[in-house]
Amino acid sequence: MANTVIVGTQWGDEGKGKIVDMLAEQAGAIVRFQGGNNAGHTLVVEGEQCILHLIPSGVLHQGKKCLIGNGVVLDPEVFLKEIDGLAEKGVDVSPERLMISKKTQIIMPYHKLMDNCRESLKSADNKIGTTGRGIGPCYEDKMNRCGIRAADLADPELLREKIVAGLQEKNVLFEKLFNVEALDAEKVYQEMLPIAERVKPYLADVSSIIQDVNKEGKDVLFEGAQGVHLDIDHGTYPFVTSSNVVSGNAAAGAGCGPRQLERIIGICKAYTTRVGAGPFPTELFDETGDTLQKNGHEFGATTGRKRRCGWLDMVVLRETARLCDLTEFALTKLDVLSGLKEIEICVAYEYRGEKVDYPPQEQNGMAHVKPVYESMPGWDEDITKASSYDELPEAARNYIARIEELSGVKVGIVSVGPDRAQTIVR
């Protein structure tokens, strides 16, 4: 299979979990390299749904190592809740196969409080649409070099020291700026101790494990979260997440060299969705948008929020292909387009009187573009039982071919339904 990176090509929710679950069979290890539990990866195996927020999507494949890299921010309570839920289903979640990098940053209670306090102060027009799970404040502490790392959970005195230091500044903000009660450092520490005890067995040197897996002749699957256009640097800033989502961060966020990243698959929904605030050039506000939302079951796996829906945006995909050096696309939810008489594809933007093929670089530039559309005939056939590319309707194959022409990237995988088996590999 080769060491493979999975990235979302749009604004998240592209169906990465399903593709990771499918490819995990061929991998020796699956590693999450960025983000936190602000992402929800939904797996459906033989009709049974499983939603994961932190644990790699390959966990349902027994015997595969599942790793959480140093680029992730981990909420230990969510982690423990997930392993307990998986254990109830009979899934092996022992420390022998599930491991957390000792360098992973830990989301603390005060990060979540800070996240919600900040969002509450913003006007309706300035809200980012954060999930309120403490992701941003945790990354902020990491950059300020005062964060709590997973290894600190095994050192009670250092843990207490860091909690006390961390709350000195934050409590001033809570009381003076946000008008909420300050947190008691000792209470936070005492509440963390039993959690730390349960997490400690899972701590490991993830970087070395990745090297060992490759030395054994096995491949590693790098699982990204969110989407490239939520990337802190390359996304629709400031309506972005707090980490680098691009494929290049797989090396830094997992602890390996860039030459170990051999195959880069961009997961692409057959239309476009976005959760929360931020520019969305191809968003639909009509009956077609409602149809996509309904037929695609477009509700966030993490927040339950209704997703905004629109036509496929090739400007967005072209930019992702450039930023991530994609080797192929995995096209998901193609079945949702069945029944549409006509399908629109955004092939370019009009921006400041010019036609552009890539997103503008200026802040909020995407809010001022006009999509240039190309129409293609749709298809009526139910494609959910198609098991080969040739079984797809001609119009569906033409749609895929046009995506390849406009992006210069091959569509190597086509998903025609939520179940693992409803996947066509070309």
From Swiss-Prot:
Q: Which PROSITE patterns match?
A: ADENYLOSUCCIN_SYN_1, ADENYLOSUCCIN_SYN_2
- Active site per database record: D13, H41
- Cofactor: how bound: Binds 1 Mg(2+) ion per subunit.
Q: Which residues bind GTP?
A: 12-18, 40-42, 307, 333-335, 415-417
Q: Look up the record and report any one GO term of the cellular component aspect.
A: cytoplasm
* Keywords for the protein's UniProt record, in alphabetical order: Cytoplasm, GTP-binding, Ligase, Magnesium, Metal-binding, Nucleotide-binding, Purine biosynthesis
Where is this chain's protein located in or outside the cell?
Answer: Cytoplasm
- Name the CDD domains on file: AdSS
Q: Name one Pfam family in it.
A: Adenylsucc_synt
Keyword Transcription belongs to the record:
no
List positions binding IMP. D13, E14, G15, K16, N38, A39, G40, H41, T131, R145, Q226, T241, R305
Look up the record and name the cofactor or cofactors this protein needs: Mg(2+)
Question: What protein family is recorded?
Answer: Belongs to the adenylosuccinate synthetase family.
Role summary: Plays an important role in the de novo pathway of purine nucleotide biosynthesis. Catalyzes the first committed step in the biosynthesis of AMP from IMP.
Under the heading HAMAP family, the entry gives: Adenylosucc_synth (MF_00011)
Complex formation:
Homodimer.
Identify this protein by name.
Adenylosuccinate synthetase
Q: What is the lineage of its organism?
A: Bacteria, Pseudomonadati, Thermodesulfobacteriota, Desulfovibrionia, Desulfovibrionales
Gene that specifies this protein: purA
